[in-house]
C-alpha cells in the first residue's frame, strides 16, 4: 500500500464520516488506480459540454418526443459550441430523431454524472452528500458561461487529482455500506468511474 493510496483512503473516510461512513466496516480495497490516470481537462470539458446539450434536449423530448424544433436548435448550438462530435452514440440519436424512449430516459438520467464532471472543473462544491441531489442548473451554467468549448477549457481548472481519487473511493465505500440514496450514489459513480477508463460513453461502464 503506497502513501498516496493511504492519503486517498484517509481523505475519503474523512469526507464520508458526517454521512455515516464507518471505517471499521470497510472491506473495499483501496483504489489501485493511479490518481494520475484520471482523464485530463480537455476530455472532461468536452464530456461536460456534450452531456449538457444532450440532457437539455432529453428534458425537452420528455415533454414532447416530436419536438423537432428543439432537436434542430440543439444540433446547431452544440455544433457552434464545438462539442457535437464529442457526444455518445445515444446522445447523437436524440439529435437526429432515431432514438428510443429508453435513450431519452438514459440521457436524462445522466444529470448527476454531468454535475460530478462540472465539479471536477471547479464548477461547484464537491458532491459528498449521498442524499442531496446536485444543482443541475449550476452544472449547465458552467457550460453556458463558457460560450464555446475552447473558452470553457480556458476558464476551467481541474480540481486536484487527489480530490478526484478520494471522491471515487468515497462513492465505492458508500455503495459497499449502502449509505445514502443508492440511486444517487450509482448515478454519480457513472462519472467517477468514467474518469478512470478509456470508454467515452459513460452509460456503457459497468461496476
Predicted segments — roles?
Residues 2-207:
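Extended, charge-rich alpha-helical interface modules
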Amino acid at each position: 500500500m503506497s502513501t498516496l493510496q493511504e492519503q486517498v483512503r484517509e481523505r475519503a473516510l474523512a469526507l464520508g464520516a458526517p454521512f455515516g461512513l464507518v471505517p471499521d466496516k470497510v472491506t473495499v480495497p483501496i483504489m489501485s488506480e493511479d490518481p494520475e490516470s484520471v482523464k485530463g481537462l480537455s476530455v472532461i470539458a468536452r464530456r461536460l459540454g456534450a452531456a449538457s446539450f444532450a440532457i437539455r434536449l432529453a428534458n425537452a423530448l420528455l415533454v414532447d418526443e416530436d419536438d423537432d424544433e428543439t432537436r434542430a436548435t440543439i444540433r446547431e448550438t452544440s455544433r457552434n459550441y464545438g462539442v457535437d462530435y464529442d457526444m455518445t452514440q445515444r446522445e447523437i440519436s436524440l439529435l437526429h430523431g432515431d432514438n428510443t424512449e429508453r435513450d431519452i430516459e438514459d440521457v436524462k438520467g445522466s444529470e448527476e454524472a454531468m454535475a460530478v464532471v462540472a465539479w471536477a472543473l471547479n464548477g461547484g462544491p464537491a458532491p459528498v452528500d449521498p442524499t442531496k441531489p446536485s444543482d443541475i442548473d449550476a452544472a449547465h451554467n458552467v457550460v453556458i458561461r463558457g460560450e464555446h468549448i475552447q473558452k470553457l477549457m480556458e476558464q476551467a481548472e481541474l480540481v486536484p487529482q487527489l480530490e478526484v481519487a478520494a471522491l471515487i473511493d468515497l462513492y465505492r465505500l458508500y455503495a459497499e455500506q449502502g449509505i445514502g440514496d443508492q440511486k444517487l450514489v450509482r448515478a454519480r459513480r457513472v462519472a467517477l468511474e468514467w474518469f478512470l477508463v478509456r470508454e467515452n460513453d459513460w452509460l456503457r461502464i459497468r461496476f
